[in-house]
Amino acid sequence: MNIKEEAIETEGIVKESLPNTMFRVELKNKHIVLAHLSGKMRKHFIKIVPGDKVKVELSPYDLTKGRIVYREK
Protein backbone atom coordinates (compact mmCIF):
# COMPACT_ATOMS: atom_id res chain seq x y z
CA MET A 1 0.00 0.00 0.00
CA ASN A 2 1.17 3.48 -0.85
CA ILE A 3 1.65 5.99 2.01
CA LYS A 4 -0.43 8.55 0.11
CA GLU A 5 -3.38 6.14 0.02
CA GLU A 6 -3.23 5.69 3.80
CA ALA A 7 -3.26 9.44 4.60
CA ILE A 8 -6.41 10.85 6.21
CA GLU A 9 -7.59 14.00 4.43
CA THR A 10 -9.71 16.53 6.30
CA GLU A 11 -10.52 20.24 6.26
CA GLY A 12 -9.61 22.90 8.77
CA ILE A 13 -8.98 26.58 9.40
CA VAL A 14 -5.51 28.06 9.93
CA LYS A 15 -5.35 29.57 13.43
CA GLU A 16 -1.70 30.61 13.70
CA SER A 17 1.32 31.02 11.45
CA LEU A 18 4.63 29.72 12.85
CA PRO A 19 8.24 29.90 11.56
CA ASN A 20 9.47 27.64 8.73
CA THR A 21 6.08 27.40 6.95
CA MET A 22 4.46 25.66 9.93
CA PHE A 23 0.87 26.39 10.93
CA ARG A 24 -1.57 25.55 13.71
CA VAL A 25 -4.76 24.29 12.09
CA GLU A 26 -8.09 23.69 13.81
CA LEU A 27 -9.88 20.75 12.20
CA LYS A 28 -13.65 20.44 11.79
CA ASN A 29 -13.78 18.21 14.88
CA LYS A 30 -12.13 21.04 16.95
CA HIS A 31 -8.75 19.26 17.26
CA ILE A 32 -5.63 21.43 16.82
CA VAL A 33 -2.81 19.98 14.66
CA LEU A 34 0.62 21.25 13.65
CA ALA A 35 0.87 21.29 9.84
CA HIS A 36 3.59 22.15 7.35
CA LEU A 37 3.21 23.29 3.75
CA SER A 38 3.46 20.66 1.01
CA GLY A 39 6.33 20.87 -1.47
CA LYS A 40 4.18 21.84 -4.46
CA MET A 41 2.63 24.71 -2.49
CA ARG A 42 6.11 25.95 -1.53
CA LYS A 43 7.30 25.61 -5.13
CA HIS A 44 4.41 27.69 -6.49
CA PHE A 45 4.64 30.30 -3.68
CA ILE A 46 1.08 29.76 -2.45
CA LYS A 47 0.67 31.94 0.62
CA ILE A 48 -1.31 30.84 3.67
CA VAL A 49 -2.56 33.34 6.27
CA PRO A 50 -4.51 32.79 9.51
CA GLY A 51 -8.20 32.38 8.71
CA ASP A 52 -7.66 30.45 5.46
CA LYS A 53 -9.67 27.26 4.92
CA VAL A 54 -7.28 24.42 3.99
CA LYS A 55 -7.22 20.68 3.29
CA VAL A 56 -4.83 18.77 5.56
CA GLU A 57 -3.43 15.25 5.16
CA LEU A 58 -2.83 13.45 8.46
CA SER A 59 -0.76 10.32 8.97
CA PRO A 60 -2.66 7.50 10.69
CA TYR A 61 0.43 6.99 12.90
CA ASP A 62 0.56 10.54 14.35
CA LEU A 63 -2.70 12.47 14.28
CA THR A 64 -1.13 15.61 15.80
CA LYS A 65 0.93 16.48 12.71
CA GLY A 66 -0.12 17.02 9.12
CA ARG A 67 0.60 18.49 5.71
CA ILE A 68 -1.39 21.30 4.08
CA VAL A 69 -2.15 20.17 0.53
CA TYR A 70 -4.78 22.68 -0.67
CA ARG A 71 -5.99 26.19 0.16
CA GLU A 72 -9.68 26.91 -0.45
CA LYS A 73 -10.53 30.05 -2.37
From Swiss-Prot:
<keyword id="KW-0699">rRNA-binding</keyword>
<dbReference type="GO" id="GO:0003743">
    <property type="term" value="F:translation initiation factor activity"/>
</dbReference>
<dbReference type="InterPro" id="IPR003029">
    <property type="entry name" value="S1_domain"/>
</dbReference>
<comment type="subunit">
    <text>Component of the 30S ribosomal translation pre-initiation complex which assembles on the 30S ribosome in the order IF-2 and IF-3, IF-1 and N-formylmethionyl-tRNA(fMet); mRNA recruitment can occur at any time during PIC assembly.</text>
</comment>
<comment type="function">
    <text>One of the essential components for the initiation of protein synthesis. Stabilizes the binding of IF-2 and IF-3 on the 30S subunit to which N-formylmethionyl-tRNA(fMet) subsequently binds. Helps modulate mRNA selection, yielding the 30S pre-initiation complex (PIC). Upon addition of the 50S ribosomal subunit IF-1, IF-2 and IF-3 are released leaving the mature 70S translation initiation complex.</text>
</comment>
<dbReference type="Pfam" id="PF01176">
    <property type="entry name" value="eIF-1a"/>
</dbReference>
<keyword id="KW-0694">RNA-binding</keyword>
<dbReference type="GO" id="GO:0019843">
    <property type="term" value="F:rRNA binding"/>
</dbReference>
<dbReference type="GO" id="GO:0005829">
    <property type="term" value="C:cytosol"/>
</dbReference>
<dbReference type="InterPro" id="IPR004368">
    <property type="entry name" value="TIF_IF1"/>
</dbReference>
<dbReference type="InterPro" id="IPR006196">
    <property type="entry name" value="RNA-binding_domain_S1_IF1"/>
</dbReference>
<keyword id="KW-0963">Cytoplasm</keyword>
<keyword id="KW-0648">Protein biosynthesis</keyword>
<dbReference type="GO" id="GO:0043022">
    <property type="term" value="F:ribosome binding"/>
</dbReference>
<feature type="domain" description="S1-like">
    <location>
        <begin position="1"/>
        <end position="73"/>
    </location>
</feature>
<protein>
    <recommendedName>
        <fullName>Translation initiation factor IF-1</fullName>
    </recommendedName>
</protein>
<comment type="similarity">
    <text>Belongs to the IF-1 family.</text>
</comment>
<dbReference type="InterPro" id="IPR012340">
    <property type="entry name" value="NA-bd_OB-fold"/>
</dbReference>
<keyword id="KW-0396">Initiation factor</keyword>
